[in-house]
Amino acid sequence: MGSRYQRLEKIGEGSYGVVYRARDITTDVIVALKRIRLESVEEGVPCTAIREISILKELRHENIVRLLDVCHSENRLNLVFEYMEMDLKKYMDRASGNLDPATIQEFMRSLLKGVRFCHERNVLHRDLKPPNLLISREKELKLADFGLGRAFGIPVKKYTHEVVTLWYRSPDVLLGSTQYGTPVDIWSVGCIFAEMAIGAPLFAGKNDADQLLRIFRFLGTPSSQVWPSMNLYPNSTNMLSKPEFQQNLIATCDEQFQTHPAYAKLGPQGIDLLRRLLRYEPGERLTAAQALEHPYFSVEF
């Protein structure tokens, strides 16, 4: 391993390893080297890493970061990925949160293409957020960090609901849903779409309850007509009986769409697409394939 890849600099640190910019000495190509430390030889490779490897080996698409090589030693696992210049969060920070409408549309198209490809192959990403979307020098956007990804088959298995960084977590997951499918990723896509427009996270909650409250303030307190499955989740009774959830919060999104200048970048079609991604009822959210057919993608900016 050491002979083929020369580490150049540390570029990131995840929950179970360090990422380096490195050079493939045999080809002189710059790569990203994810080095995963194995806690003990008996424990072996972390299941998150095995999951990522098995998923990425199957996923070959222009909008998904490519796994080039896997090297395994007694106490270390190295995953070699194509190298990408930066992630979407850094890209937005560099632009001071001011992305132009054409860039937002192109990134959104790429994001949905990558998600559609995953979902067609029965893979949930489950942790879509700007730091997990990588941008190449040519401004191509690709999905990365499938550590939480899970092949879902028939989406009725019990999954852990502790997935997706809080700000991108759907209301059904916040209420403890463990039987979810592709709509959990679609909610995250909607949050990212809004963030690209306004230059800041749409729902920057401090905890689960605060997160849900921010969603209610933006979209309005849902009724059982708007969200039929609302009372069926494990935490529904506990969470929704809190005093702050008893008041009827009027939706502020209409007002914000009209008065927040950043939303004008999306145009009426973009706002309509955003609404269709951020639906309370999971089954009412557009699929990635449906979203790609939305008129927003025919608008010329």
From Swiss-Prot:
Forms a stable but non-covalent complex with a regulatory subunit and with a cyclin. The modification Phosphothreonine is found at T160. ATP binds at I11, G12, E13, G14, S15, Y16, G17, V18, V19, K34. This is Cell division control protein 2 homolog 1. Its EC number is 2.7.11.22. Belongs to the protein kinase superfamily. CMGC Ser/Thr protein kinase family. CDC2/CDKX subfamily. SMART domains: S_TKc. GO terms for cellular component: cytoplasm; nucleus. One of its GO terms (molecular function) is ATP binding. It catalyses: L-seryl-[protein] + ATP = O-phospho-L-seryl-[protein] + ADP + H(+); L-threonyl-[protein] + ATP = O-phospho-L-threonyl-[protein] + ADP + H(+). Phosphorylation at Ser-15 or Tyr-16 inactivates the enzyme, while phosphorylation at Thr-160 activates it.
